[in-house]
Amino acid sequence: MEKPNTKQVLLFYCVEAEELARKVAAQSPLITLQSINWRSFDDGFPNLFINNAQDIRGQHVAFLAAFSSPAVIFEQLSVIYALPRLFVASFTLVLPFFPTGSFERMEEEGDVATAFTMARILSNIPVSRGGPTSVVIYDIHALQERFYFSDNVLPLFETGIPLLKQRLDQLPDADKIVVAFPDDGAWKRFHKQLDHFPMVVCAKVREGDKRIVRLKEGNPAGCHVVIVDDLVQSGGTLIECQKVLAAHGATKVSAYVTHAVFPKNSFERFTHKDDGSDKAFTYFWITDSCPRTVKSIANKAPFEVLSLAGSIADALQI
């Protein structure tokens, strides 16, 4: 039996995530935005104030975070640790992008697996009157990272793939779509959610000193191929993958990643230029999990933003 969604949620947010927070609130009359005064002392350390602290007692409270750089994490953690202690009925942390997820293992003694460090920090969020904090994360880099969190919090792992499927259904060549994975990791991660599409799997192989991308299985010839992965940094693998797929006869190549990190404006490698040069990617879909990137790539082809707002609004009702 379906439970009606009737939970009134008060949503706080960090400065960077304001636009996404407004979109989330627009999804449901049950979500009301709240505010925090984000200030700094002269020495740079945060001077924070949670507005209406007494009015949120007994209410369901959530915080939308964006850990875009180490510099902003401390001020947001200060708020995240304070909110559950204000006698709230329940507390939910929404962290769309778990930033240290790609450093999740030690390859030699001395490596520091910062994904585990971040999970331990979040596992120590105080319990609220309603019990442990719920931590909502989208497409965490490695699935085993769910076990890095302690029993003090309840991690909820969501995905942006339904947004991609919805968008692919709207394409004029929806019947010609083939999904490609840049490596076995991406295939293991996403193939079950996309198993109604024909699939292509690429692989990185070592040739001398170089690592090159090869087609491992599947046939992209005559199709619109969409490369799917959880995140992009410099984009080098996607570009190599596109070249291989085009060489094997793909008529169009597009890409989807949930988290467009793009450090040092590396998205510029993908933008369509006006000089008539080859447009390698027809579409490049990303979500708004990394607000800084979304601002930087606004209205730049081939990028299209698929918003997580509706999915976050639903998660807040769980």
From Swiss-Prot:
Region (Binding of phosphoribosylpyrophosphate), start-end ranges: 222-237
InterPro entries: Pribosyltran_N, PRibTrfase_dom, PRTase-like, Rib-P_diPkinase
Disulphide-bonded residues: none
Primary residence: cytoplasm
List of residues binding Mg(2+): 139, 141
Listed GO CC annotations: cytoplasm; ribose phosphate diphosphokinase complex
The enzyme's E.C. designation: 2.7.6.1
GO biological process: 5-phosphoribose 1-diphosphate biosynthetic process; purine nucleotide biosynthetic process
Record localization: Cytoplasm
GO molecular function ontology, one term from the record: ribose phosphate diphosphokinase activity
Keywords, sorted A to Z: ATP-binding, Cytoplasm, Kinase, Magnesium, Metal-binding, Nucleotide biosynthesis, Nucleotide-binding, Transferase
EC class: transferase
Catalytic function, reaction form: D-ribose 5-phosphate + ATP = 5-phospho-alpha-D-ribose 1-diphosphate + AMP + H(+)
Domain of life, source organism: Eukaryota
Pfam families: Pribosyltran, Pribosyltran_N
Family: Belongs to the ribose-phosphate pyrophosphokinase family.
NCBIfam families hit by this protein: ribP_PPkin (TIGR01251)
Entries under PANTHER family matching the protein: RIBOSE-PHOSPHATE DIPHOSPHOKINASE FAMILY MEMBER, RIBOSE-PHOSPHATE PYROPHOSPHOKINASE 4
Protein name: Ribose-phosphate pyrophosphokinase 4
The species this protein was found in: Spinacia oleracea
